[in-house]
Amino acid sequence: MIKAPILQSLLASRDDLTHNPEVNNFGGKEQECLYLLKRCHNIDEFKQVHARFIKLSLFYSSSFSASSVLAKCAHSGWENSMNYAASIFRGIDDPCTFDFNTMIRGYVNVMSFEEALCFYNEMMQRGNEPDNFTYPCLLKACTRLKSIREGKQIHGQVFKLGLEADVFVQNSLINMYGRCGEMELSSAVFEKLESKTAASWSSMVSARAGMGMWSECLLLFRGMCSETNLKAEESGMVSALLACANTGALNLGMSIHGFLLRNISELNIIVQTSLVDMYVKCGCLDKALHIFQKMEKRNNLTYSAMISGLALHGEGESALRMFSKMIKEGLEPDHVVYVSVLNACSHSGLVKEGRRVFAEMLKEGKVEPTAEHYGCLVDLLGRAGLLEEALETIQSIPIEKNDVIWRTFLSQCRVRQNIELGQIAAQELLKLSSHNPGDYLLISNLYSQGQMWDDVARTRTEIAIKGLKQTPGFSIVELKGKTHRFVSQDRSHPKCKEIYKMLHQMEWQLKFEGYSPDLTQILLNVDEEEKKERLKGHSQKVAIAFGLLYTPPGSIIKIARNLRMCSDCHTYTKKISMIYEREIVVRDRNRFHLFKGGTCSCKDYW
């Protein structure tokens, strides 16, 4: 007779068990308990069912029952379920490979990757032989920990056990090596595959996306689509959309969207969020909003993508309204959402509103402010020209002041040409022994503004000694599905001669509009004429010349940049949009700029 109220409710609809005389034999008892196990919806129900397994001597006499109980708990996702699962595991006299796999998978699911590796070590010490279900989860743990050493050791064990031909293991190896930066090893595993499946290609694409290798990611994706009849898996599609978002490859992103609509009846929230992110970063805010509004369910990542997108387009007030909508829907803002909202305030000059959001975050107490949040606050004040207040904020921060905070402050000091405060930030940044080449370049540029040429030379010498390499600034234009990449003073393009002829024509036209180059943007100790020549060849100007030549008359010229544009390029582009009567959209590292009729959507606040 079952007396516990929870168990009675679980069995309420199962008359075939409660009234069946055979339920008293061993098989019947086990069937009853396994049925109860499936119906558990929380840890309290589960504990009562677990107790019943023990009371009926099923847990210790049936390995199948013990493994089922363990798997239900470990894979449930309930709060603290893995702690309870660990106690269940210790109660099993002779755990089998399935039980170890259950624990490894459970720990990986809750992101306790070190625990997963510990269980694998215990498994090997006890003599349990891993199987093809063991390694995908284990390699995922190595991937998330960036533990290439352990990953290579596990690869060796995979080889010894003859599991290297298993498709799931192969794809996990490709992903692990790729995301740990070992691209050659990732490619080597891929090339050895006898049959390259959609999953293998998707693993290659995802690995490149995980390392921010956007161009390589898209090359692989295009290769898969053109050289095979395979259709990428969801993970590959999401990675390709991420790459499109980061390179401004709108046409390819739209093609992927079309493919998804034709082949998948209902897009899940991950894919829909990826589409929102792709469209906002490719300059199509209306399309992103359309997808967002049609979504039946939205999560924090969806709102974060939309709020960040509105911020990119200078729609700070709309971003704040979106934030309010999220709260009304009952979602609790997390770390990522607050960063997005604070960035939106920063890029729209909403100082009062940004302070209010930050104060509310502190008051709520559900999100502990990190260096990233404080960095947003410093950026908000710095962009508004409140550098003294920004420094006071930094000095009052209750957490360790890391490179993010000082880099943000230094960047705003350089923009505002405040050498005195900038030197304070530079000194603090150098104390942190930064190995970020961008930091040294920022410091060097600050010294250049102050004509402190000895300090410039010393900083650049340090860059050389440390072997640091700065990624050069570039601008990208997409034309007929192909991306054209330009760097400063670029003469590598096949149409170089025509492009520079166009640049010369543009320069001639600008003289009649009163354009005067801002020589302060060339931070080198060279004469005035040399500075003018260097300004002419900035990558954005070369990209605009290409766009004017080869895009249809009257169409919008779209440019994606990897760095913030300089003030001279900003002024230059405003005037070109008026002279040639063309809309020019530029996405730099911080936001979108829509140049039209001699003005910019950022209202000169960027």
UniProtKB/Swiss-Prot annotation:
<feature type="repeat" description="PPR 2">
    <location>
        <begin position="131"/>
        <end position="165"/>
    </location>
</feature>
<dbReference type="GO" id="GO:0008270">
    <property type="term" value="F:zinc ion binding"/>
</dbReference>
<keyword id="KW-0677">Repeat</keyword>
<feature type="repeat" description="PPR 7">
    <location>
        <begin position="299"/>
        <end position="333"/>
    </location>
</feature>
<feature type="region of interest" description="Type E(+) motif">
    <location>
        <begin position="481"/>
        <end position="511"/>
    </location>
</feature>
<dbReference type="InterPro" id="IPR002885">
    <property type="entry name" value="Pentatricopeptide_rpt"/>
</dbReference>
<comment type="similarity">
    <text>Belongs to the PPR family. PCMP-H subfamily.</text>
</comment>
<feature type="repeat" description="PPR 1">
    <location>
        <begin position="96"/>
        <end position="130"/>
    </location>
</feature>
<feature type="region of interest" description="Type E motif">
    <location>
        <begin position="405"/>
        <end position="480"/>
    </location>
</feature>
<dbReference type="InterPro" id="IPR011990">
    <property type="entry name" value="TPR-like_helical_dom_sf"/>
</dbReference>
<dbReference type="Pfam" id="PF14432">
    <property type="entry name" value="DYW_deaminase"/>
</dbReference>
<feature type="repeat" description="PPR 5">
    <location>
        <begin position="233"/>
        <end position="263"/>
    </location>
</feature>
<dbReference type="InterPro" id="IPR046849">
    <property type="entry name" value="Eplus_motif"/>
</dbReference>
<dbReference type="GO" id="GO:0009451">
    <property type="term" value="P:RNA modification"/>
</dbReference>
<dbReference type="InterPro" id="IPR046848">
    <property type="entry name" value="E_motif"/>
</dbReference>
<dbReference type="Pfam" id="PF01535">
    <property type="entry name" value="PPR"/>
</dbReference>
<feature type="region of interest" description="Type DYW motif">
    <location>
        <begin position="512"/>
        <end position="606"/>
    </location>
</feature>
<dbReference type="Pfam" id="PF20431">
    <property type="entry name" value="E_motif"/>
</dbReference>
<feature type="repeat" description="PPR 9">
    <location>
        <begin position="370"/>
        <end position="404"/>
    </location>
</feature>
<feature type="repeat" description="PPR 3">
    <location>
        <begin position="166"/>
        <end position="200"/>
    </location>
</feature>
<feature type="repeat" description="PPR 8">
    <location>
        <begin position="334"/>
        <end position="368"/>
    </location>
</feature>
<dbReference type="Pfam" id="PF20430">
    <property type="entry name" value="Eplus_motif"/>
</dbReference>
<feature type="repeat" description="PPR 4">
    <location>
        <begin position="201"/>
        <end position="227"/>
    </location>
</feature>
<dbReference type="InterPro" id="IPR032867">
    <property type="entry name" value="DYW_dom"/>
</dbReference>
<dbReference type="InterPro" id="IPR046960">
    <property type="entry name" value="PPR_At4g14850-like_plant"/>
</dbReference>
<dbReference type="GO" id="GO:0003729">
    <property type="term" value="F:mRNA binding"/>
</dbReference>
<dbReference type="Pfam" id="PF13041">
    <property type="entry name" value="PPR_2"/>
</dbReference>
<protein>
    <recommendedName>
        <fullName>Pentatricopeptide repeat-containing protein At1g31920</fullName>
    </recommendedName>
</protein>
<feature type="repeat" description="PPR 6">
    <location>
        <begin position="268"/>
        <end position="298"/>
    </location>
</feature>
